[in-house]
Amino acid sequence: MPCVQAQYSPSPPGSTYATQTYGSEYTTEIMNPDYAKLTMDLGSTGIMATATTSLPSFSTFMEGYPSSCELKPSCLYQMPPSGPRPLIKMEEGREHGYHHHHHHHHHHHHHHQQQQPSIPPPSGPEDEVLPSTSMYFKQSPPSTPTTPGFPPQAGALWDDELPSAPGCIAPGPLLDPQMKAVPPMAAAARFPIFFKPSPPHPPAPSPAGGHHLGYDPTAAAALSLPLGAAAAAGSQAAALEGHPYGLPLAKRTATLTFPPLGLTASPTASSLLGESPSLPSPPNRSSSSGEGTCAVCGDNAACQHYGVRTCEGCKGFFKRTVQKNAKYVCLANKNCPVDKRRRNRCQYCRFQKCLSVGMVKEVVRTDSLKGRRGRLPSKPKSPLQQEPSQPSPPSPPICMMNALVRALTDATPRDLDYSRYCPTDQATAGTDAEHVQQFYNLLTASIDVSRSWAEKIPGFTDLPKEDQTLLIESAFLELFVLRLSIRSNTAEDKFVFCNGLVLHRLQCLRGFGEWLDSIKDFSLNLQSLNLDIQALACLSALSMITERHGLKEPKRVEELCNKITSSLKDHQRKGQALEPSEPKVLRALVELRKICTQGLQRIFYLKLEDLVSPPSVIDKLFLDTLPF
């Protein structure tokens, strides 16, 4: 036997790694072997590692003493090529012993602390005699108090580079310093082993004053089996038979555990016990979080543009339209669908929808401001810029104004009918009854247009049905005169009615009587005011939405009227109107009501004349609107 040591004597010269020989076949050169190369597999039960080492086998020798167990410096040699492969004898009840005793390993300045054994030394013949390739621990006499357990250090990360340390293996025929990592065998042959290198420092005395184990940590890697990878002793031994090199493992009377690989900064209780912590799931990369929809086309929109949450496409379209002052024409009936798929079909309807949802044209930089990212020119700030903390107070007036303009343009006839237009003396041809019937027909057509127009005013449909009907019937004559005055070319005696019919003044004189001259004068005065379309839209809405006798909820009607007035004031305050329009609109309302009184007088006269019985709807409207 090449190494024999006494129990309490220093190690003989032949037991050190510098003079260790085995026969005459091996040299005594000192080398630094490469540490084990690890092949890691992530499994569902934990982290398994397949280790292949460059030494074929290693062994320690010990002497049997019934009352002492002390680890001596390792004497390692190489097995002859013809010798049998070392096997590993597993402990059959190591899980129970592991749970009953908490063992800690303190690795500091290249030494180990003394531990109390958890199982008495082997006494049976089967447990006492093991192959020469096994490692034994025997209890040392309790000359000094045992050192209390220290918390284990966190295991080195797999990414850390293993430092070089002097080894105690003599190269021989079976040892190749350039040996490559052996590919992993079958899943059953993989052995979960954790290697923790020791820094190349000389041993230091125990910090607690106790004797440390006489085991050189640079001689071999510290081995530890996690509990999660433990299995029956027989199956483990059979699985390890196919390993390229036999790895001796001592009976686990004292366990040196290392925390397994974890993804957290500090080891948890489960990692200290060798259990595999649950791996965190990858973050959920949801593409729809935090995004809204475009108010114009319904596409994805991340932020607001020009006061409204819109997509990049509608933002660019609106900006180009405003900067170029482009004018679009709808080839259909001005109600084309605007969505993600069909938003490029009609530019007119797309731009009108941009305005209706509240996009502000004044926010778009003009040609003189293109490319500037600084401050806008100093001018009176709009309420939108002065009070950004509020939820956008000017938005309701802007939305109301756009809706009123859209309602007025929709009520305008698209095609003019000149089929009955006759400016000569033949215009007076026909009987009086025919002219009166024509007068009634034009009034009836105006009622239908007024009803569809009123339903497009924001907030009107929220009123009670009774109030809606009362407001429309009370203002039908005012709306009739106002639309006729806006569309007609009274300077040439051309009157354009709600259904698109164009008649000369002489063609209408026998049915309208003197009321037609009052309408012509009002039209000339209104057109001389140079009101823009926004002011005309507000004038039309205010002529209907006003205080009337018999309303069920007059407060709500008053609130709606105030919103329309605020829209007109806001339009004037921004300087968009050519001239101050609010006083002109109020004066026009007063004149309009006077003209409507003359219209009621004309209907009353035709009823008395009784040439043609009026339609039921005209008769009812006449009776409901009488001031007495």
UniProtKB/Swiss-Prot annotation:
Positions of the UniProt region annotated as Interaction with NCOA1, NCOA2, NCOA3 and KAT2B: 1-293
Database matches in SMART domains: HOLI (SM00430), ZnF_C4 (SM00399)
UniProt-annotated stretches for the region Disordered: 96-163, 269-290, 366-396
Pro residues compositional bias, start-end: 142-151
GO CC entries: nucleus; transcription regulator complex
Location(s), subcellular: Nucleus
Compositional bias per record (Basic residues), positions renumbered to this chain: 97-113
A GO biological process held by the record: negative regulation of transcription by RNA polymerase II
Protein name: Nuclear receptor subfamily 4 group A member 3
Region annotation Interaction with KAT2B: where it falls in the sequence: 381-628
Positions of the NR LBD domain: 396-625
Ranges where the record places region Required for DNA-PK heterotrimer: 1-140
UniProt region (Activation function (AF)-1 domain), positions on chain: 1-112
